[in-house]
Structure formats: C-alpha cells, structure tokens
Curated annotation (Swiss-Prot):
Name this polypeptide is given: Inter-alpha-trypsin inhibitor heavy chain H3
Gene: ITIH3
Biological source species: Pongo abelii
Parts of the chain that traverse the membrane: none
Compartments, record wording: Secreted
Assigned keywords, A-Z: Glycoprotein, Protease inhibitor, Proteoglycan, Secreted, Serine protease inhibitor, Signal
Function of the protein: May act as a carrier of hyaluronan in serum or as a binding protein between hyaluronan and other matrix protein, including those on cell surfaces in tissues to regulate the localization, synthesis and degradation of hyaluronan which are essential to cells undergoing biological processes.
Length: 876
C-alpha cells in the first residue's frame, strides 16, 4: 500500500525552518488555478510498478512547483505496506538530481538535522512506527523552484486467500493534472486471473480511466483519470480520489512448486492445490476484562459466531476466557459437531466483561488443554493444534512481567504448535504480543477499533482455517546451496504460499532438484521439483520486461525480513550478530529497514562527506581549507591532496609524467573497484616538463564484480554495463540507477556511488576554446571511501586508511608567504613547503581555497615505493 496522502499532493504547507504554517483548502479559491494551493502546485503524480515473480518494484514520482515568492515547506506522509522496504528517494531541484543514501539510522538523522539547522533543502526518509507503515519526507521548496520527488520501494507480494494483492492508498486530496498508476506484471508460470478496483469510485464510473489486461506471462493495469473524472461533481474543485486502489492476481499452477534461477540465485515457490484439509484443534483464548466492554466485546462475539459457522466437523475447539481469573466453556476440547456448535453459539452470546487482565494464566490454560488433548488421544492423530488469543490491553494481575509471560508460554508450547496473537486497539504492548507469537511460530495482528473490527477478526481466522500440511520441510541437494532463507514451516495453509530463496554454489549446473516434505490429512507427502537449467533460460528469456537481478534482491529482502524477526527475541551476542548481518544487507542492497534511514541533501551544501578528491585548475598555488573528515583529490599538474583529520591538516604532491601516461589512482581487490587516470598536456609542443602543464584528460572507473566500466573524457561519458554501452554528453542531465550503483551527470559535475560508503565526484574544467596554452581537463574527488577495504591502494587509495605525520621546524622559505618545514612521515624525514590548492567540487570556475604542505619529488617518501610503480598500461 502506498498512500499518496501527501506524496500525491495532500501537502502540509508552511515552513519548518521559520516560515509560518498555513493549511489550505481548494474549495472557494476560484481565483487560483486548479491544483494550486498556497502557491504550491502538484501537477503530476505517477506510480509505476513492475512485478516480476511476485517481487514488486514500485516508483512513485510527484512533481511540485512553488509559484509563491517565498520558500514553502512541503511535507509528505507516504503509507506503504508494512512489509515493504524503501530502496531509493531522489530529489530533483530545478533540474539537478540529488540521490538518497542509505545509512545507519543515527548517522542519517545527524546528517539531516545538520542540514536543516543550516536552512538547507533536505529530505529524510525513515521508518516510522512498529512495522514500516509510514515514511515521512519534508522539503523546503525555494520560491519559483520545481521539485520532483521520486520514491522507490520493493516488496514481496504475499499470497492471501488464493490471490496476490497489491494495495495502493490513493489520497491526493486535490486535483492533479497528470495522475496515473501503471502496473506491469511478469509471471513465468503464466497469469490465471487479474483484477483491479478502487474503493473511492464504482466500476461504472471508472470508465475509460481504468484498463486491465493479461495474456500468457504478462499482465497490465493502467489508471489515468482526467481532471473531470477526478471531480465528485462537474463544478467541484476537490478530488474524489480518496481511498484504496487494489490489484489482485494469481498464477497458473501446473505443479505444486516452481523454481526460478537467475545469475546464481534461486527462488522456490510452493503452493499445492487440491489437498484435503488437516483437522485442527483450536483454543480460543479471549480477553473479557472490563476494558473490552461495549463495542469491542460485541464485535468479538459477532466474529466468533461467524467463525463457528466455518468450523468443520473434524475440528475440535474450546473457549478460554480470562479477566482477573480464568474460566472455560468446557473442561477439555470438544468436537465441532452441530450440537456442540449450537451450544458454543449460546456460550459466546452470553460472554460478559468483568475485572482485570490475566494474560499469563489464560494462555497457559489454553496451551495445557491442547497438550492434554494430544496426550490423552482426545483429538485425531493427524490433526494440528492452534492457539488464538485476543486481548485489548496489558497484563495487570497475576504474572504481569512480559518477559516472564513469554518464557512461560514458550516453555509450555515447546515448539509443538503456533500461537497467534490479536491485539485489539492501541492501548496495549503490541511488541510483546508480536514477539511472543513469533517465537512460537505464529504472528500477531492488530485489530483496529473500527466498524469492521469483526470482519478483521474473521478475516484473520480464514487465513489459518484450512491447514493442508504440517511439519513442512524444503530440502535441496547437499552442498549445492548457500545462504538459504527459512525452509521449515509448521503449517501450510490453503490459499497461501511458501517462498524459499538462496544462492547456488555452482552456477553452471545442468539441473536443480527441490523436495518438499510434509504431513497431510491422510499420509505423509513429498513433492519433487526438478529444473532443467536450459529450459529455465527459455522461460525467463523475456528479460527486457523484468527488472534487474530481481531474484537476488528478493533473496536479500527475505533474508533481511527473517533476520529482523529473529532479532526481536534474541539477546546478547546472538542479537548483535543478527543486527550486524541485517544492517550489512540493508546497506548493500539500499533497503530502508528499522536499522537504516535514507537521507538526501544537496551535495554542494553537505559538509558531512567523509572524503573528497578533485583536480584544480592550472594555478599550482591554489589553496586548501581542510574539512573535518578525510579528504582526497587529484588536480593540476597533477596535484594530489591528502587530508588527515587527526592533524586538521593536509599534504600535497605532484606527479610529473609525459602525456599519455596512465596512473593507478585507486585499486581495491576486495570490492573490485579501480580508478585510473590518463595524463594530457597543454597545447604547447615543447616536451620541457618544467614549462609544460599536464592534467588528467581521461578517467576510467571500473567495478569488476558488477561488470561495470565508465570512461570519462572532457567531451563525453561512456558507460559499459554488462556489455551494454551508453554514451552521454556533459550537457546531459541524467541519472543511471541499478543494484548497488548510481551515476548522475549534471553539466560539469558527475557523481558515481557504489551503494553506501563509496562515492566519487568528477568535475569538468572548461577553458576558452581558443586559449593558446590551456585545454579542458578533469578533477577527481573521493567523497566517501569508508566501505572500501583495508587492502585498497593506488596514489590516492593508499591513504584511505589512517596514517600519522608530524610537522616541525617551521622556518622561512624562499618565498616569505610560503614557509618551509620538516615532515616526519612513514619513517622518512622530508622538506616540505606551505602552499595552497583549490577545491573545485562546489564551483568548477572559482573553487575554494585549502591550505596544505607540499611534498617534492613526485611524493617520494610519502607514497609507497616510487611514482612509476603506479603507471599502468591502459585505463581498464
């Protein structure tokens, strides 16, 4: 579910940073253009979704213009599925693109608060609440500015009652000139049904605004209401787009399972059909304390009466009621015969609220009843037991410590059957209910206090009403897979689906086999799925229709989700390890999870960047002002700048080599990243190095692991991505995004990021074309290197790890403005001179002065070895 309540245009206007808030209404503002309020116009909102094998990649784009003559703050609250992870958030301000970076939560929060305190345009995307239900972005929009917000999120669509459901919350609350939802679905198994509907408009009124179709493996849904179709009446200026837009579909199932393999990762879907239902033994543990009085208890009764209608004759049940004490309908479980069900209805109708809340004793009574029924053979041998508890508050009598109740319940169940906890309303410790359910192989649901609470309760029961298998184990060939997600389940319920993903040890295997074992209603079953790898390639040959390495991302998504669940009940070292693994994957795959946040700030305003690398202009005596964090760049003749934050100072050296020479700037054997630069000379033909200026005219950035190369020259940027070539001009404003990579060109500035922790900036320096001596050249900045390994080397890379130096004996030099000194570094004693360079990262024309100590003789004594050790034969 993505609520466009604010991302779509229900904007809360004013300014967080000094401007008064002024909420607006469209009604009655006839003098304003349609869709404009308080000077802000949301003129476009689009949702583009690509679903590949249940994995949905969704991009929400909203375009806003501030017509006012003062800055305005725009706040967006975006409702998403609780299981979705945001993967990217991009601001485009007046045509300039600023991407988000996923960071550890506290790091992102500090960076955002610093930007806001300085009055800078900044947006923070963070998980809010228990289950990632809401993401908030606030941005200060300058007068006359256009801002585009692009939010990307991914989720695995879960099968629910026989259908996959994509749920979009649509609430623009004003007319939007261009509003559209486009959904493309690709399912290798073939699509068996596809539907779409909106809660805010009847199917008759949807008319031409909605189109839906499916054939074979592909499905498509489009919703594009015109301005007239958005109005509740012909003269209205508000919008009727306010509610749910739901897409449902299912796939063909020629066999119970389906395995798909792409680039060494696999996903296994399992959903058998036509099996007999396993009889179930249900202990309903119901809170009837005083707080349940009135509508809550009445809705609970209505739901239980409906559930009794669905009970099968083979099922067994009992009701355990708890308040200050515990009472039961029967002494033990009874079969769901017509006579017993009628008696149960009478009992449910008679339930009355009273007293306190004794969760511990209520649960233990229900669990004991199930255990005893099994021990005394009162229930069928091939049956399964379930505890369903409903409460609206916290324990306040008897054992009331949550951790002790959890321990008691865990010991009593002993892993034999699941516990499902239903939390009614908001006045309860939901985390406690959720954690207790998760560690007992169940889950928790919040039942919202609303008119449909009884339907919510009944809907939950329908999910678990028909177990088809128990004790499910998914097995693969020994030593053939790595990093497997959860592959054992206590139950498989009708209408659901089991999803397992992992990594293949050998990508070149010819076939792949998967076995699923489980206990059915009448016998034990084994389902075998064998995959021919060549046939698999044919089935997935329509790769243009799907996005990227979707199975790898699906695997990462599932792994993170399951690590976070395990983490909730872990302690000490185990919890630390689970947290570290989940955080590492969240950062690697750019997922916003409870451990991470995403922050966007204008790069030229952001002073939090860890490191920077640039190459200034022809003035060798430019200057340098070191920031507080490590800073590296290469510039000029070329000049290399190395900042050491521990010293609040910087070092500089030149490399004098002939035009055409290629130098190794960065090489990291662990991440596969390399950066090389080729030297060019000025326009003079003289080979005299004392007078001839040299610069970097060409850069090669490559990542062997990602099969990615980019060649940057003063004329163009050429990208090779898995053998696909793309060429861009420096005049282009373009962004390229793929798993783990973003590349943005904005006139004389290019930003290349490899996930979180590695970011480079290339600056184009242009001179007058008819200048008799100078020519265009490039500057290279390292703005973040903290994710590069300790084995990184190169003329710049060797300094990414901390090192120490000492400056002493400062004395007058040949130039009174540039003192000399003695530098002790790496066991070498060197003569250095104070000078300055320029950082052109913020302004390619003027630059910013930064002071440094200059090391002579091509950096000898400062760099490892000699400078000729860094000469390489070519860019790649």
């Amino acid at each position: 579910m993505v609520a466009l309540s604010h991302l779509g245009s229900a904007l809360q206007l004013g300014s967080l940073w000094g401007f008064p808030r002024s909420p607006f209404r469209l009604l009655g503002k006839r003098s304003l253009p349609e869709g404009v309020a308080n000077g802000i116009e949301v003129y476009s909102t689009k949702i583009n979704s690509k679903v590949t094998s249940r994995f949905a990649h969704n991009v929400v784009t909203t375009r806003v213009v501030n017509h006012a003559d003062t800055a305005k703050e725009v706040s967006f609250d975006v409702e998403l599925p609780k299981t979705a992870f945001i993967t990217n958030f991009t601001l485009t301000i007046d045509g300039v693109i600023y991407p988000g970076n996923v960071k550890e939560k506290e790091v992102a929060k500090k960076q955002y608060e610093k930007a806001v305190s300085q009055g800078k345009t900044a947006g923070l995307v963070k998980a809010s609440g228990r289950k990632l239900e809401k993401f908030t972005v606030s941005v200060n929009v300058a007068a006359g500015s256009k801002v585009t917000f692009e939010l990307t999120y991914e989720e695995l669509l879960k099968r629910h009652k026989g259908k996959y459901e994509m749920y979009l919350k649509v609430q623009p609350k004003q007319l939007v000139k261009h509003f559209e939802i486009e959904v493309d679905i690709f399912e290798p198994q073939g699509i068996s049904m596809l539907d779409a509907e909106a809660s805010f408009i009847t199917n008759d009124l949807l008319g031409s605004a909605l189109t839906k179709s499916f054939s074979g493996k592909k499905g498509h849904v489009s919703f594009k209401p015109s301005l007239d179709q958005q109005r509740p009446c012909p003269t209205c200026t508000d919008s009727l787009l306010n509610g749910d837009f739901t897409i449902t579909y299912d796939v063909n199932r020629e066999s119970p399972g389906n395995v798909q393999i792409v680039n060494g990762y696999f996903v296994h879907f399992f959903a058998p059909q036509g099996l007999p239902v396993v009889p179930k033994n249900v202990a309903f543990v119901i809170d009837i304390s005083g707080s349940m009085a009135g509508r809550k208890l009445e809705q609970t009764k209505e739901a239980l009466l409906r559930i009794l209608e669905d009970m099968k004759k083979e099922d067994y049940l009992n009701f355990i009621l708890f308040s200050g004490d515990v009472s039961t309908w029967k002494e033990h479980l009874v079969q769901a015969t017509p006579e017993n069900l009628q008696e149960a209805r009478t009992f449910v109708k008679s339930m009355e609220d009273k007293g306190m809340t004794n969760i511990n004793d209520g649960l233990l009574r229900g669990i004991s009843m199930l255990n005893k029924a099994r021990e005394e053979h009162r229930v069928p041998e091939r049956s399964t037991s379930i505890v369903i508890m409903l409460t609206d508050g916290d324990a306040n009598v008897g054992e009331s410590r949550p951790e002790k109740i959890q321990e008691n319940v865990r010991n009593a169940i002993g892993g034999k059957f699941p516990l499902y906890n239903l939390g009614f309303g908001n006045n309860l410790n939901y985390n406690f209910l959720e954690n207790m359910a998760l560690e007992n192989h169940g889950f928790a649901r919040r039942i919202y206090e609303d008119s449909d609470a009884d339907l919510q309760l009944q809907g939950f029961y329908e999910e678990v009403a028909n177990p088809l298998l128990t004790g499910v184990e998914v097995e693969y060939p020994e030593n053939a897979i790595l990093d497997l997600t959860q592959n054992t389940y206590q139950h498989f319920y009708d209408g659901s689906e089991i999803v397992v993903a992992g990594r293949l040890v050998d990508e070149d295997m010819n076939s792949f086999k998967a076995d699923v074992k489980g206990h059915g209603a009448t016998n034990d079953l084994t389902f075998t799925e064998e995959v021919d790898m060549k046939e698999m390639e044919k089935a997935l040959q329509e790769r243009d229709y799907i996005f990227g390495n979707y199975i790898e991302r699906l695997w990462a998504y599932l792994t993170i989700e399951q690590l976070l669940e395990k983490r909730k009940n872990a302690h000490g070292e185990e919890k630390e390890n689970l947290t570290a693994r989940a955080l590492d994957l969240s950062l690697k795959y750019h997922f916003v999870t409870p451990l991470t946040s995403m922050v966007v700030t204008k790069p030229e305003d952001n002073e939090d960047e860890r490191a920077i690398a640039d190459k200034p202009g022809e003035d060798a005596e430019a200057s340098y002002q070191p920031p507080q964090n490590p800073y590296y760049y290469v510039d000029g003749d070329p000049h290399f700048i190395i900042q050491v934050p521990e010293k609040d100072d910087a070092l500089c050296f030149n490399i004098d080599e002939a035009p055409g020479t290629v130098l190794r700037l960065i090489q990291d054997p662990v991440t596969g990243l390399t950066v090389n630069g080729q030297i060019i000379g000025d326009k003079r033909g003289s080979p005299d190095s004392k007078t001839k200026k040299t610069y970097f005219g060409k850069l090669g950035i490559a990542n062997a692991q990602m099969d990615f190369q980019v060649e940057v020259t003063t004329e163009k940027v050429t990208l090779w991505n898995r053998a696909v070539q793309s060429t861009f001009s420096w005049l282009d404003t373009v962004t390229v995004m793929q798993d783990g990579l973003s590349m943005m060109i904005n006139r004389k500035n290019m930003v290349v990021s490899f996930g979180d922790g590695v970011t480079f900036v290339v600056v184009l320096h242009q001179v007058w074309k008819k200048h008799p001596v100078h020519r265009d050249f490039l500057g290279f900045y390292v703005v973040d290197s903290h994710r590069m390994s300790a084995q990184t080397h190169g003329l710049l890379g060797q300094f990414f790890q901390p090192f120490d130096f000492k400056v002493s004996d400062i004395r007058p030099g040949s130039d009174p403005t540039k003192p000399d000194a003695t530098l002790l570094v790496k066991n070498h004693q060197l003569i250095v001179t104070r000078g300055s360079q320029k950082d052109y990262r913020k302004d390619a024309s003027i630059g910013t002065k930064v002071v440094r100590w200059f090391v002579y003789n091509n950096g000898e004594g400062l760099i490892d070895g000699v400078h000729t050790d860094y000469i390489v034969p070519n860019l790649f």
